[in-house]
């Protein structure tokens, strides 16, 4: 079995001229974008740093130890991967610019982006959901908001990048980043659509059924390349594109979402024949349930679910992991205050998530415990 590090060991000495940019490179850059680049990668599109320069400056930051520990849900070897890129021939001279990092609890907004110049050609990578509860809530807000803040941020970012660079673009993103790149390609002007060469979606949450019927979507559909692990959970939230690859992962259950667990052979992924039964059941059950709700009901569900989570006082998954007992007690108290109808609805959705996430995601651990052990009648 082989991962990103093996890929760089095999292909790291080969330039992009010798081996063109491919799907593995797209996922690798999408994953590296989880790195805490604040104050290291230039915000301007005109000022650029190579991977080698970024790695050097990254190690000099005052909060270096905090930067390499980027939360419970992001692979702890992410910084190591960035350093590996800085050392190898293939990535050493790739330039980074246009860094953005926007976070607002008030607006329920979490967005970050980096533009990589690969042989001078721009690859826009949009960060996925991070460790914050705000980031997760924004994902679920896709259910009822026409455009979540991160989708608006992504479209604006692409317009700025398109004004700064000539020629074609590659858009790539993992998790929520996958949703953002597809949405950006659909919502931008026809002129900008023509400048998009490829769109890479790696296990991103989907869209409503109507989204795929738009003329604007059909204009870029053949440029979209979607990939999901066999045990996909995030990618099964809402409806996904009809064309996709299923990737073999060494991760267990939900942790197959971790891009570093995806298995690589040469410049390609090792594929699986189908999704797991658990993933297929979750996709069917969750989307049949959410499709039956009107917009107001969806909004109410998200606010209720995250109202319980926010009652813990935690800001991140890591916070909940550290204070699991306190968090659980506060969430149970918040749940107990709900009326009977809302409790019943919460138990229904918790059962769906319990079947696919078990104890994997800290923000859901207390809720799963609540589902298993509460002596509150639904």
Predicted regions and their residues:
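Short glycine-enriched nucleophile-adjacent loop
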Residues: 181-190
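Alpha/beta hydrolase fold serine-hydrolase catalytic domain that processes acyl esters and thioesters
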Residues: 1-113, 118-122, 126-141, 145, ...
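Gly/Ala-rich beta-loop-alpha elbow adjacent to hydrolase catalytic centers
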Residues: 172-177, 181
